[in-house]
A protein has these predicted regions:
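Conserved, mostly hydrophobic/aromatic
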Residues: 5, 12, 22-23, 79, ...
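Residue-level preference for long, well-ordered alpha-helices that form the structural scaffold
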Residues: 1, 47-58, 123, 127-131
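Short, acidic/polar
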Residues: 1-13, 135
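Conserved alpha/beta catalytic core and glycan-binding cleft of carbohydrate-active enzymes
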Residues: 62-160
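Active-site-proximal, well-structured secondary-structure segments within enzyme catalytic domains
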Residues: 24, 32-36, 99
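Active-site-proximal loop/turn and secondary-structure-junction residues that shape catalytic pockets
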Residues: 24-28, 83-85
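Aromatic- and acidic-residue-enriched carbohydrate-binding clefts of CAZyme catalytic domains
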Residues: 32-56
Length: 160
């Protein structure tokens, strides 16, 4: 399957595509065996996040993709990975240029800042200070390997 994805990416790159947005890319490695997700009291469904996100081979897979498809075109391709549930520490690993995985990530932690006791369908007023603290935390956590200015550069990615 990975080889087929690399072939598809190469096909698009040969036609002039400059980059890829990779949705839920942190879900491509799973913890096996897959089991039923634990279901909280009153929940309609279980939460499988621990079994499907940031799996044991995720960094291996992303590095392999980078080396086989992207590295042969230095400076010509940009990658951004959508990573629901990723922590800032995980995002720093995914975007560290020395690791050769992704250029940027985007996440949704700040979106949940208005979740009330009933979750996202029970929104509460947004506290501007909390939002600023959240975004500043992400910028500081990713700053060692990236440009926290909001500008995308060829050498470093912007993450938030």
């Amino acid at each position: 399957m990975r080889r087929a994805v690399y072939e598809m990416m190469t096909w698009w790159l040969e036609r002039g595509v400059d980059g890829f947005r990779m949705d839920v890319i942190n879900f491509i490695s799973k913890t096996y065996p897959l089991t039923d997700a634990p279901q909280g009291e009153g929940d309609l469904y279980g939460n499988a996040f621990a079994a499907v996100a940031n799996g044991p081979r995720i960094h291996e897979f992303l590095h392999e993709m980078n080396q086989q498809v992207l590295a042969p075109r230095p400076g010509h391709v940009i990658t951004v990975g959508e990573m629901p549930g990723a922590t800032s520490a995980e995002a720093a690993l995914y975007t560290d240029p020395a690791r050769g995985e992704l250029d940027m990530v985007f996440q949704f932690e700040h979106v949940s800042l208005t979740d009330g006791p009933g979750g996202k369908f029970d929104p509460q007023p947004l506290d501007l200070v909390t939002l600023k603290q959240n975004l500043a935390h992400w910028q500081a956590a990713l700053a060692p390997a990236t440009t926290p200015t909001g500008a995308v550069s060829a050498e470093k990615g912007w993450n938030s």
